[in-house]
């Protein structure tokens, strides 16, 4: 019987068949962790040297070999072999080819369990920084757009029906606040990712006199995990990321859904740049909002990655199980998806053309000023419920007569209630309706300018 030549093969008499090997291998995707695997190994072997577990000479020779591997990796000169299963075994084999049997000492006081957890913490910690940078850029684009459209008036909707006139900037600031909370969630995610699993070993720690604090400091983590079993068993930092990413994608998807509607012939509120639209292969007139639709569509795949990993984790006993190999591809794909989506959404918004006239025109139809008349009557002492009923009858009669509220004469309006006077026509103007809503968080122009100023100040403080 052929001897098992795997680095872990001492206990085995038989060999693994190729098709089984292909099923179990992860190198096709976990090679994304190669840089972090080398960085983690450099910290580990430096710690081994400083604690006397390896001689300083041994530690330095291994570090030289690892640094050479890192240079070759960055130059695209490393080839990985599926026979070596995963990125950890591939890197150890490559190191052995470079420095000989001394490479075998690198794995002293370390398991692949804490090794892969360390790689993934390092990877996600870096990616969270990129996500937050792109979110900050998107929020900046939103603020710039909002600042230019405080006085641009559009219909506000409930149930996709005209509700009340609002400032377009106000609508944009609603999304700004959603994205701000997304940023805060990712920042909290950083806290849980900024923990070092290295030195946890397989699950129970090690008998070697390692210095886990030193390893953590070398890798610039805030602190080591305080329980080794926890360090190698859980992937909640990834689940937290996938959850945050799902909420972010939901917010982007909702925004894209609105832009898809707004650029349609039925709305004509905005025009998307040609850069973010695609034509039809058969209909020459078409300009389709494909990029917005793709963000909306990709939201589902991010949700899927979250539910997939939750399902993997739900019944796993402590500590490590091979099921955890399934934690990576969804994370990698989610990172790529949200980074690209943030770029595309920011690009769409920065090149957006706003049709102010169409927005304004739309507010003058479908009775979005009806609440103004009800508030007007309530402000003159009429109980709001009675005012609501009066205006409801007027709206019904307006529909039957094909009129807008402002089309009725004063004498006609006074037949509905005597409290209505000449000044009602000012109140029925969309601009007045917006301007008067200056309660905290309202759509009044002063309030919107205040919201923008507060947001800009907070953004500047973050820089």
UniProtKB/Swiss-Prot annotation:
Q: Where in the cell is it found?
A: Cytoplasm
The protein's annotated catalytic reaction(s) are: 2-(N(omega)-L-arginino)succinate = fumarate + L-arginine
The question of whether Cytoplasm is a record keyword is answered with yes
Q: Name one GO biological process term.
A: L-arginine biosynthetic process
User: Which PROSITE patterns does the record match to this protein?
Assistant: FUMARATE_LYASES
Q: What Pfam families does the annotation carry? A: ASL_C2, Lyase_1
Pathway, per record: Amino-acid biosynthesis; L-arginine biosynthesis; L-arginine from L-ornithine and carbamoyl phosphate: step 3/3
Name the NCBIfam families for this protein. Answer: argH (TIGR00838)
The UniProt family comment states: Belongs to the lyase 1 family. Argininosuccinate lyase subfamily.
Name of this protein: Argininosuccinate lyase
Q: Which organism is it from?
A: Streptococcus pneumoniae serotype 2 (strain D39 / NCTC 7466)
């Amino acid at each position: 019987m052929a001897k098992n030549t795997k680095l872990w093969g001492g206990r085995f008499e038989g060999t693994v068949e190729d098709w089984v090997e292909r099923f179990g291998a992860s190198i096709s995707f976990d090679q994304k962790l190669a840089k972090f695997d080398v960085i983690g190994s450099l910290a580990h072997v430096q710690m081994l040297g400083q604690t006397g577990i390896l001689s300083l000479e041994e530690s330095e020779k291994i570090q030289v070999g690892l640094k050479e591997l890192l240079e070759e990796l960055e130059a695209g000169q490393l080839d990985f072999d599926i026979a070596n299963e995963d990125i950890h075994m591939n890197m150890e084999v490559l190191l052995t080819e470079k420095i000989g049997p001394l490479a075998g000492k690198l794995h002293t006081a370390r398991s692949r369990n804490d090794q892969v957890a360390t790689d993934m913490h390092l990877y996600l910690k870096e990616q969270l920084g990129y996500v937050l940078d792109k979110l900050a850029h998107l929020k900046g684009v939103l603020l710039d757009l909002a600042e230019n459209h405080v006085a641009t008036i559009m219909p506000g909707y409930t149930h996709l029906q005209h509700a009340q006139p609002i400032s377009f900037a106000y609508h944009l600031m609603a999304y700004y606040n959603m994205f701000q909370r997304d940023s805060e969630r990712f920042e909290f995610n950083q806290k849980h990712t900024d923990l070092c699993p290295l030195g946890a070993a397989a699950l129970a720690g090690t008998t070697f006199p390692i210095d886990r604090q030193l390893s953590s400091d070398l890798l610039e983590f805030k602190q080591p995990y305080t329980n080794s079993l926890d360090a190698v068993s859980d992937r909640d930092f990834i689940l937290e990321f996938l959850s945050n990413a799902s909420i972010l994608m939901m917010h982007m998807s909702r925004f894209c859904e609105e832009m898809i509607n707004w650029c349609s012939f039925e709305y004509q509120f905005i025009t998307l740049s040609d850069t973010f639209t695609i034509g039809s292969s058969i209909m020459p007139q078409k300009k389709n909002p494909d990029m917005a639709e793709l963000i909306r569509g990709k939201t589902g795949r991010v949700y899927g990655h979250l539910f997939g990993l939750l399902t993997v984790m739900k019944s796993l006993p402590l500590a490590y199980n091979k099921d955890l190999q399934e934690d990576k591809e969804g994370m990698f794909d989610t990172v790529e998806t949200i980074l690209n989506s943030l770029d595309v959404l920011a690009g769409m918004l920065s090149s957006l053309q706003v049709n102010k006239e169409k927005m304004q025109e739309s507010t003058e139809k479908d009775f979005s000023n009806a609440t103004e008349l009800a508030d007007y009557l309530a402000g003159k002492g009429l109980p709001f419920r009675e005012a609501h009923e009066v205006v409801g009858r007027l709206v019904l009669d307006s529909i039957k007569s094909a009129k807008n509220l402002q089309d009725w004469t004063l004498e006609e309006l006074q037949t509905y209630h005597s409290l209505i006077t000449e000044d009602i026509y000012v109140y029925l103007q969309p601009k007045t309706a917006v301007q008067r809503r200056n309660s905290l968080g309202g759509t009044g122009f002063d309030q919107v300018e205040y919201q923008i100023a507060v947001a800009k100040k907070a953004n500047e403080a973050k820089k």
